Amino acid sequence: MKIAIASDHAGFRYKELVKKHLASKQIEFEDFGTNNEKLCDYPDFIAPAARALQAQKVDRLIVLGGSGNGEAIVANRFRGVRCCLCLNAEMARLARMHNDSNAISVGQRLIGENQLLTIVDTWIDTKFEGGRH
């Protein structure tokens, strides 16, 4: 599995934590930026990452911002990207299980650091249920 990851300035710190976590689990990733906490426009980083998912250059996508809302909106503009805002592990589990989400958006200002990696792991480890979904 290869995961694209991108953030704006408000999600940069959590993006760096997710990258370290993915590396520790030997999960390949590609970082689309931003590369610091300097104010920036999130679509500049989210759109290229979503394009990579759309083009099947990566298997999944994680985007991060202040609330995660704008990032999810941008990601979902690309055909084939199914990005769900996940504020807890249950949302991440259902995003995969029922919605076959191939992308998640996380809000750094809305969740605690202790929740972040649980959300990511739950989303990565959960299988799509299929069937009526």
What are these model-predicted stretches?
Residues 47, 51, 73, 93-96, ...:
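Alpha-helical segments flanking ligand/cofactor-binding loops in enzyme cores
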Residues 28-39:
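A short beta-strand-loop structural module common to alpha/beta enzyme folds
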Residues 63-109:
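Mid-chain, well-packed structural core segment of small domains
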Residues 2-3, 58-61, 80-82:
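Short active-site oxyanion
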Residues 45-63:
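Short, structured active-site "lid" loops
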Residues 13-24:
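Short, solvent-exposed amphipathic alpha-helices that sit
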Residues 4-6, 10-13, 89-133:
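C-terminal binding/interaction regions
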